[in-house]
């Protein structure tokens, strides 16, 4: 019923009603982010009850509850959590967010300090709990991809022209390099699918 668009330049998420019969959209709501936070993009949980917005300038993730209303969706911010560790680089920018296949964990990449953060996700409340923020052996991780097995992660390092691979150790709360680094000219985006 609805289409949402993150507008990083004006710190807003625009909500549009989609009329599939007429092929039209109409603006019905605006979700305002904190000023100069830079909402980059967002993810919905598979059950449609929550969505997550990563802010590249403030280095936070906002968690919202979501209900599809008749005319306007009902959204409520339930959490704001940092994407970096305790001592982030001043030039850090939160970049990408991905769920593991069962949505019990979320990952976020941070350019500048060149890290990946992992969160435990409560599937009932949607809330996140930061488990680690670790370096990724590359420069400017513009995107990350989680393998279908949920046990491996790829970091697309835009400025160093590389893709680094890691095994995720959920119990110990860390990632370990796994396999050789691939050289790729300025990688931007990746989606790994099971065939």
Residues of each region from the PLM?
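Beta-rich, blade/repeat-based domains predominating
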Residues: 1, 33-48, 83-103, 137-152, ...
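Conserved beta-strand positions in repeat-built beta-propeller and related beta-rich domains
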Residues: 5-8, 45, 53-56, 108-111, ...
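Structural signal for beta-propeller blades
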Residues: 11-13, 59-61, 114-116, 161-163
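Short loop/turn segments immediately following beta-strands, especially the blade-tip
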Residues: 16-24, 64-74, 119-126, 167-174
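A short beta-strand motif characteristic of beta-propeller blades
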Residues: 26-32, 79-87, 129-135, 177-182
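Acidic, glycine-rich loop-and-beta core segments that form the ion-binding/anion-interacting portion
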Residues: 30-84
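C-terminal hydrophobic structural anchor segments
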Residues: 117-167
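Blade-level signature of beta-propeller repeat domains, shared across WD40, Kelch, NHL, RCC1
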Residues: 158-164, 176-195
């Amino acid at each position: 019923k609805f289409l949402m668009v993150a507008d990083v330049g004006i710190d807003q998420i625009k909500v549009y009603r989609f009329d599939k019969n007429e092929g039209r959209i109409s603006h019905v709501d605006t979700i305002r982010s904190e000023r100069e936070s830079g909402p980059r993009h967002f993810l919905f949980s598979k059950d449609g009850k929550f969505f997550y917005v990563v802010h590249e300038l403030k280095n936070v993730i906002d968690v919202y509850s979501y209900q599809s209303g008749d005319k306007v969706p009902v959204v409520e911010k339930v959490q704001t959590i940092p994407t970096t560790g305790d001592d982030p680089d001043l030039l850090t920018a939160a970049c990408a967010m991905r769920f593991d296949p069962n949505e019990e964990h979320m990952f976020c990449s941070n350019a500048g300090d060149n890290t990946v953060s992992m969160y435990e996700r409560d599937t009932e409340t949607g809330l996140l709990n930061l488990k680690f923020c670790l370096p990724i052996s590359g420069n400017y991780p513009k995107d990350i991809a989680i393998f279908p097995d949920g046990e491996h992660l790829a970091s697309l390092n835009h400025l160093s022209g590389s893709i680094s691979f890691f095994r995720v150790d959920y119990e110990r709360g860390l990632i370990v390099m796994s396999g050789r680094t691939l050289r790729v000219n300025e990688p931007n985006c990746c989606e790994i699918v099971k065939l």
